[in-house]
Amino acid sequence: MLDLGLSKMALIGVVALVVLGPERLPRVARTAGALFGRAQRYINDVKAEVSREIELDALRTMKTDFEQAARNVENTIHDNLREHERDLNAAWNSAVSPGGSAAADAPDGPSAASGEPSWRSIAAAPAKRRNWRVKKAVTPVWYKRATMRRTQVQSGAARVARHRPASLRRPARFL
Protein backbone atom coordinates (compact mmCIF):
# COMPACT_ATOMS: atom_id res chain seq x y z
CA MET A 1 0.00 0.00 0.00
CA LEU A 2 1.95 3.04 1.21
CA ASP A 3 5.53 2.56 2.18
CA LEU A 4 5.69 4.71 5.31
CA GLY A 5 8.68 4.11 7.52
CA LEU A 6 9.62 5.75 10.79
CA SER A 7 11.76 8.40 9.10
CA LYS A 8 8.97 9.41 6.68
CA MET A 9 6.43 9.61 9.51
CA ALA A 10 8.80 11.83 11.52
CA LEU A 11 9.26 14.10 8.49
CA ILE A 12 5.47 14.39 8.06
CA GLY A 13 5.14 15.23 11.78
CA VAL A 14 7.76 17.99 11.59
CA VAL A 15 6.15 19.53 8.48
CA ALA A 16 2.72 19.40 10.18
CA LEU A 17 4.16 21.06 13.29
CA VAL A 18 5.65 23.87 11.20
CA VAL A 19 2.55 24.36 9.02
CA LEU A 20 -0.19 23.98 11.66
CA GLY A 21 1.55 25.20 14.73
CA PRO A 22 1.69 23.70 18.21
CA GLU A 23 -1.85 24.87 19.18
CA ARG A 24 -3.81 23.20 16.37
CA LEU A 25 -1.59 20.14 15.83
CA PRO A 26 -3.05 17.94 18.64
CA ARG A 27 -6.62 18.61 17.50
CA VAL A 28 -5.78 17.86 13.85
CA ALA A 29 -3.87 14.73 14.89
CA ARG A 30 -6.88 13.48 16.89
CA THR A 31 -9.22 14.16 13.97
CA ALA A 32 -6.86 12.46 11.52
CA GLY A 33 -6.51 9.46 13.85
CA ALA A 34 -10.29 9.18 14.22
CA LEU A 35 -10.80 9.37 10.45
CA PHE A 36 -8.04 6.84 9.87
CA GLY A 37 -9.60 4.47 12.44
CA ARG A 38 -13.03 4.91 10.85
CA ALA A 39 -11.59 4.11 7.42
CA GLN A 40 -9.89 0.99 8.79
CA ARG A 41 -13.13 -0.22 10.42
CA TYR A 42 -15.05 0.40 7.19
CA ILE A 43 -12.47 -1.55 5.16
CA ASN A 44 -12.55 -4.41 7.69
CA ASP A 45 -16.38 -4.47 7.57
CA VAL A 46 -16.32 -4.64 3.77
CA LYS A 47 -13.77 -7.47 3.88
CA ALA A 48 -15.86 -9.37 6.43
CA GLU A 49 -19.03 -8.91 4.38
CA VAL A 50 -17.33 -10.12 1.20
CA SER A 51 -15.96 -13.19 2.97
CA ARG A 52 -19.40 -13.84 4.50
CA GLU A 53 -21.02 -13.68 1.06
CA ILE A 54 -18.43 -16.09 -0.33
CA GLU A 55 -19.11 -18.52 2.53
CA LEU A 56 -22.88 -18.17 2.04
CA ASP A 57 -22.50 -18.89 -1.66
CA ALA A 58 -20.47 -22.00 -0.85
CA LEU A 59 -23.10 -23.07 1.70
CA ARG A 60 -25.89 -22.55 -0.84
CA THR A 61 -24.15 -24.75 -3.39
CA MET A 62 -23.53 -27.39 -0.70
CA LYS A 63 -27.22 -27.19 0.27
CA THR A 64 -28.42 -27.71 -3.30
CA ASP A 65 -25.98 -30.61 -3.75
CA PHE A 66 -27.17 -32.19 -0.51
CA GLU A 67 -30.85 -31.74 -1.42
CA GLN A 68 -30.24 -33.27 -4.84
CA ALA A 69 -28.48 -36.26 -3.27
CA ALA A 70 -31.33 -36.67 -0.76
CA ARG A 71 -33.89 -36.59 -3.59
CA ASN A 72 -31.92 -39.22 -5.50
CA VAL A 73 -31.77 -41.48 -2.43
CA GLU A 74 -35.48 -40.96 -1.80
CA ASN A 75 -36.35 -41.80 -5.41
CA THR A 76 -34.27 -44.99 -5.38
CA ILE A 77 -35.87 -46.07 -2.10
CA HIS A 78 -39.36 -45.41 -3.46
CA ASP A 79 -38.56 -47.30 -6.66
CA ASN A 80 -37.28 -50.28 -4.67
CA LEU A 81 -40.33 -50.22 -2.41
CA ARG A 82 -42.70 -50.10 -5.39
CA GLU A 83 -40.90 -53.03 -6.98
CA HIS A 84 -41.09 -55.09 -3.78
CA GLU A 85 -44.74 -54.14 -3.31
CA ARG A 86 -45.51 -55.31 -6.84
CA ASP A 87 -43.77 -58.61 -6.08
CA LEU A 88 -45.70 -58.98 -2.81
CA ASN A 89 -49.03 -58.19 -4.51
CA ALA A 90 -48.29 -60.71 -7.23
CA ALA A 91 -47.37 -63.37 -4.66
CA TRP A 92 -50.44 -62.53 -2.57
CA ASN A 93 -52.79 -62.69 -5.54
CA SER A 94 -51.29 -65.97 -6.72
CA ALA A 95 -51.64 -67.47 -3.23
CA VAL A 96 -55.20 -66.18 -2.67
CA SER A 97 -56.67 -66.96 -6.08
CA PRO A 98 -57.81 -70.54 -6.73
CA GLY A 99 -56.31 -70.58 -10.26
CA GLY A 100 -52.79 -69.85 -9.06
CA SER A 101 -50.87 -68.83 -12.19
CA ALA A 102 -53.82 -67.12 -13.86
CA ALA A 103 -53.85 -64.39 -11.23
CA ALA A 104 -50.10 -63.87 -11.55
CA ASP A 105 -50.52 -62.91 -15.22
CA ALA A 106 -53.19 -60.31 -14.36
CA PRO A 107 -52.14 -56.69 -13.86
CA ASP A 108 -51.51 -55.74 -10.27
CA GLY A 109 -52.25 -52.61 -8.31
CA PRO A 110 -55.54 -50.88 -7.63
CA SER A 111 -56.57 -51.10 -11.29
CA ALA A 112 -56.46 -54.89 -11.30
CA ALA A 113 -59.31 -56.43 -13.25
CA SER A 114 -59.58 -59.42 -10.89
CA GLY A 115 -61.02 -57.29 -8.10
CA GLU A 116 -58.88 -59.12 -5.55
CA PRO A 117 -57.78 -56.93 -2.66
CA SER A 118 -54.05 -56.42 -2.22
CA TRP A 119 -52.15 -57.60 0.86
CA ARG A 120 -51.92 -54.04 2.09
CA SER A 121 -55.66 -53.38 2.04
CA ILE A 122 -56.42 -56.65 3.85
CA ALA A 123 -53.75 -56.14 6.51
CA ALA A 124 -54.80 -52.57 7.29
CA ALA A 125 -57.39 -52.40 10.05
CA PRO A 126 -60.16 -49.87 9.60
CA ALA A 127 -59.38 -46.74 11.59
CA LYS A 128 -61.74 -45.78 14.39
CA ARG A 129 -63.48 -42.52 13.79
CA ARG A 130 -63.03 -40.13 16.65
CA ASN A 131 -64.39 -36.72 17.25
CA TRP A 132 -61.33 -34.54 16.69
CA ARG A 133 -63.01 -31.48 18.20
CA VAL A 134 -63.32 -33.17 21.58
CA LYS A 135 -59.76 -34.40 21.44
CA LYS A 136 -58.38 -30.93 20.70
CA ALA A 137 -60.53 -29.22 23.31
CA VAL A 138 -59.34 -31.32 26.25
CA THR A 139 -56.48 -29.84 28.26
CA PRO A 140 -54.51 -32.40 30.26
CA VAL A 141 -54.89 -32.24 34.04
CA TRP A 142 -51.12 -32.25 34.59
CA TYR A 143 -50.89 -29.08 32.49
CA LYS A 144 -53.65 -27.42 34.47
CA ARG A 145 -51.88 -28.26 37.73
CA ALA A 146 -48.49 -27.16 36.43
CA THR A 147 -49.78 -23.78 35.26
CA MET A 148 -51.90 -23.29 38.39
CA ARG A 149 -54.99 -22.98 36.25
CA ARG A 150 -58.31 -23.18 38.05
CA THR A 151 -60.57 -25.95 36.92
CA GLN A 152 -63.63 -24.79 38.87
CA VAL A 153 -64.34 -21.09 39.11
CA GLN A 154 -65.77 -19.83 42.40
CA SER A 155 -66.97 -16.37 43.32
CA GLY A 156 -65.12 -14.33 45.92
CA ALA A 157 -67.96 -14.53 48.45
CA ALA A 158 -68.21 -18.31 48.05
CA ARG A 159 -64.45 -18.66 48.50
CA VAL A 160 -64.54 -16.57 51.72
CA ALA A 161 -67.48 -18.58 53.06
CA ARG A 162 -65.73 -21.83 52.23
CA HIS A 163 -62.54 -20.95 54.09
CA ARG A 164 -64.16 -19.17 57.07
CA PRO A 165 -63.74 -21.07 60.34
CA ALA A 166 -66.87 -22.66 61.82
CA SER A 167 -66.73 -20.46 64.93
CA LEU A 168 -67.13 -17.30 62.83
CA ARG A 169 -69.92 -18.55 60.60
CA ARG A 170 -73.44 -17.27 61.01
CA PRO A 171 -76.04 -19.88 61.85
CA ALA A 172 -78.21 -20.79 58.89
CA ARG A 173 -81.89 -20.11 59.45
CA PHE A 174 -84.51 -22.16 57.81
CA LEU A 175 -88.09 -20.81 57.75
UniProtKB/Swiss-Prot annotation:
GO BP, sorted A to Z: protein transport by the Tat complex
UniProt keyword annotations, A-Z: Cell inner membrane, Cell membrane, Membrane, Protein transport, Translocation, Transmembrane, Transmembrane helix, Transport
Source superkingdom: Bacteria
GO cellular component: TAT protein transport complex
Low complexity bias: start-end ranges: 96-115
Chain spans, region Disordered: 96-119, 152-175
Pfam families named in the record: TatA_B_E
InterPro entries the UniProt entry points to: TatA/B/E, TatB
Spans traversing the lipid bilayer: 1-21
Subcellular location: Cell inner membrane
Recorded GO MF terms: protein transmembrane transporter activity
Membrane topology, record value: Single-pass membrane protein
UniProt key word Glycoprotein: no
Skewed-composition ranges (Basic residues): 160-175
Assembly and interaction partners: The Tat system comprises two distinct complexes: a TatABC complex, containing multiple copies of TatA, TatB and TatC subunits, and a separate TatA complex, containing only TatA subunits. Substrates initially bind to the TatABC complex, which probably triggers association of the separate TatA complex to form the active translocon.
HAMAP family assigned to the protein according to its UniProt record, in alphabetical order: TatB (MF_00237)
Purpose: Part of the twin-arginine translocation (Tat) system that transports large folded proteins containing a characteristic twin-arginine motif in their signal peptide across membranes. Together with TatC, TatB is part of a receptor directly interacting with Tat signal peptides. TatB may form an oligomeric binding site that transiently accommodates folded Tat precursor proteins before their translocation.
Similarity section: Belongs to the TatB family.
Name of the protein described by the UniProt record: Sec-independent protein translocase protein TatB
Upper lineage: Bacteria, Pseudomonadati, Pseudomonadota, Betaproteobacteria, Burkholderiales
The encoding gene: tatB
